[in-house]
Amino acid sequence: MSDRVVFEAAEDGVGTVTLNRPDKLNAMDQGVFDGLHEATDRAREAIEAGTVRAILVRAEGRAFSSGLDISLFGQQASGDKPADDWIAYLQQAFTGLEDLRVPVVAAIRGVAFGAGCQLALAAHMRLAAPDAELALLEAKWALVPDLGGLTRLPRVVGLGRAADMSMTARRVDAETALAWGLVDRVLPAEDFEATSRAFVAELAAGPTVAIGAVPRSSPAAEDASVH
């Protein structure tokens, strides 16, 4: 597995997917996307085996993710995948997590910008530290949030606020995100890691297949594809 993403399964049924590139604010290069694919495959196997009953997506360091690493575009240009296939591969790194049949919870500390925000949106729930800040910055570079953000964000915050974030690259702080429904809980900074993990462990102790089916059973979730 890529060392940029770490998957761990604990005895209490919590599987943890950790972005592990703190020196780069967990910017997403090709290795991160490869690691997300590998981590999701391992999580799926553990779920099927009954050893993982809920997933926590977190990050090492002071940021959840600053977004795409600019090197990713050079890596694509020098690779042998057609652009459409490459974009589909990146999208599937997030969709694979979203499609897991147990609850998937993102724990956001610091910035979740661009692709980082889009990864958080792929989770079924989002927990935030008080210093969390979420944004889709793609408009600043004449890009679109094409890793599922344009589909998932309106489901979460509504069309108007989604347009605001997507068109203006507005940075949304934790309290505003909570008011908008962009995050579901803001947890204390001093024990954010422990509290967020305890929340996921509580989910893991419950009827996780039923809980995990809730996001996929929503009529809004069936109205559009991220592709």
Which residues fall in each region the model found?
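Terminal peptide-recognition signature
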Residues: 17, 21, 35-36, 57, ...
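Conserved CoA-thioester-binding segment of acyl-CoA-metabolizing enzymes
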Residues: 1-60, 81, 95
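A secondary-structure boundary/capping signal
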Residues: 21, 58-60, 66-69, 107-109, ...
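Glycine- (often His-adjacent) and acidic-residue-rich active-site loop
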Residues: 4, 59-95, 112, 142, ...
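Charged catalytic carboxylate motif
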Residues: 31-35, 89, 96, 195, ...
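Crotonase-fold acyl-CoA enzyme core
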Residues: 95-211
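Generic secondary-structure signature for well-ordered alpha-helical cores
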Residues: 201-209, 216-226
